[in-house]
Every structure is written in structure tokens, then in C-alpha cells.
């Protein structure tokens, strides 16, 4: 079966007063993630309605690449460094494109 491009939305919510630290930790993921095999795009957004909410918008060549990404040291370290700084856990949504331009 051919690889299917996968889009991922990953959402984290910082505890009140922790958004600057969480923002820094999120930004630290950008460069190493973009250099990974299979990464097409890896961008970070911050909610304009709630500055404690950060969303990664990612495109990968396959779900296998995403799974490998989540096991990388920089992802594991992110989880450790943000421990106690987030409301709940990271929410990850896997998407497939169903419309064209």
C-alpha cells in the first residue's frame, strides 16, 4: 500500500501564567521536527481568542513518519519539560484531505 500523506493537529493548553514558558518549549520543537525524514510542514499557531492555547499544524508523508516523530528525543523532552505546565494532556488529531482546490 502506498504512503498516504497525513495532516496532524496537535493542541496544548498552558496553565494560566505559564504560556510564555510553554510557547518557548513549543518553538524549540520546530527546527528539529522540520529536519525529520517525512516532514512536509511543521508550523506552530497560538489562539487569538485564548493565548494559552497552542496548535501545531503538521503535514507528514505517512502516519509511520508521525509515529517515529513522536518517539524522537525532542518530543520526549518536550513532554518532560512541560510536565505540570499544561492543562490536561496534548490532543492529537489525525486528518486526511477530502477536498481539492
PLM segments and residue spans:
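N-terminal first-folded block
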Residues: 4-35, 40
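Residues at secondary-structure transition points
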Residues: 1, 13, 17-20, 51, ...
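Short, well-ordered beta-strand segments in beta-rich or mixed alpha/beta enzyme
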Residues: 6-13, 43-70
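Intrinsically disordered, low-complexity acidic/polar segments
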Residues: 19-21, 53, 65, 101
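Glycine-rich beta-strand-turn "strand-cap" elements at beta-sheet edges
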Residues: 1-6, 44-52, 78-101
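An amphipathic, aromatic/His-enriched active-site/gating alpha helix that lines ligand/cofactor pockets
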Residues: 28-40, 59-93
